[in-house]
Amino acid sequence: MFAPPAARAMKVLDRSFFKKTIPTSAARIFNAKDISRCRKELTASRDTLPNNRVDPIRPDVDSERAQKGGKCLVLRPEVVHNDRTTWSPKLRDLEQDGTLGVIPFQLDLDYDFFTYSEITSAIIPPPETKQDDEIPQGFALAGHVAHLNLRERYWPYKYLIADVLADKNPMVKTVINKLDNVGTENAFRTFQYEVLHGPDDMNVELREQGCTFKFDFAKARQYATIMAGVGPFAIPAGKKKCFVWANDLNPESYKSLEDNIRINKVGDFVTPRNTDGADFIRQSAIDLLKSERSIPIYPKVKFSRSAPPTQKPVPDRTLVQPRTFQHYVMNLPASAITFLPSFIGLYSNIPGLSIGEAKKLFAPHTQQKLPMIHVHCFSTKSDDNVAETKEICAEISRQLQCEMTPETPDVNIHDVRDVAPKKRMFCASFRLPEEVAFREI
């Protein structure tokens, strides 16, 4: 009943086409002071229109009454104004005591009423088979830019889809469609795109986890930490006073990362790097051993201009940067798993440090364990992810030349999100095996 009219032949959005009139009835409220009571009672008796997107209180259909503030309540279509058998007992009681009258009413709906899903479903034919993709509903949002990844069958409708999406999402000013896979066309993880709606303005600003990020969406990706992008993982961690070394090969991402470190005032805790991920894995382990950093943490004190502090504040604790990393995050699912060989012999070739001395950096000689590796990757979809978990562990084993199974201690494979009808993103977390970390190379 509330669906828009079908428009299968439409290729260019015509907003004026989506109009619909639903014949129904309305309760004319004779006294304005009774509107609230009548609405409550008729809602309880299920006489009002059962649609949360329609305001049931409307100006009276009689123009003279409407000018004087007259209102009516829209009733469900099953209520017929001249057939009392369709009225509920409550509606009859209110009519008999003179509180209201039941009149015919035309409910007019237009483009603004219908949702994105309703409009696109009215235009685009449904999938012919279960194997076909459903009409695209989701999109990635970065600031004012909505990012689509349309399948070929929807290309004839791409501009129409973009126009409707922007109409129904006020924060969206620009809609783009990705033309290739991130990370497959170039080393900087950028992608080709086409603008479907709005200006070609990719300079975005967004806020997440109490942090502000500014970057060019076309030139920099917002992912993290060996592939750190503009810092969406590194900077929130820095806000929590975690020492983070964040690397990205893309110079545009690196520039935005530096800017965002400054904007969010986390320079004491986040160290940016601009190099290849494989080189960063090895070199950062060496550099961190040589690096010394301690950050005093001061208690929060309220200052008054009229009564400035008389003594220099004293830190209540000092945070010291560890000599080894506790976690490595590799969030580039298209290729991150291929960087795992860089961890082979990570601590076997430290200048000035023998393998025996390197082993003493970790348990049982210290409280520090070997680092956890968190690598994102793609796989297929299933209801229980059992086959996918085994497949991912097998690939990790192949990359590290060390057997890894779902039963291995500290191994955890969890699904992050669906990215396509038959494709799912996973994050594989595992502790770097000792035989890998100290293998002679």
From Swiss-Prot:
**Any one Pfam family match given in the protein's UniProt record, by short name:** TYW2_N_2
The entry's S-adenosyl-L-methionine-binding residues are R221, D248, L249, D276, G277, N331
One term under GO cellular component:
cytoplasm
> Which one GO biological process term can you cite for this protein?
mitochondrial tRNA methylation
Signal sequence range: none
Which keywords, in A-to-Z order, does the entry hold?
Answer: Cytoplasm, Methyltransferase, Mitochondrion, Nucleus, S-adenosyl-L-methionine, Transferase, Transit peptide, tRNA processing
Q: Which domain of life is it from?
A: Eukaryota
Q: Where is the transit peptide?
A: 1-9
Q: Does the keyword RNA-binding apply?
A: no
* Name of this chain's protein: tRNA (guanine(37)-N(1))-methyltransferase
Per the UniProt record, the source organism is Phaeosphaeria nodorum (strain SN15 / ATCC MYA-4574 / FGSC 10173) (Glume blotch fungus)
Please name the gene that encodes this protein.
TRM5
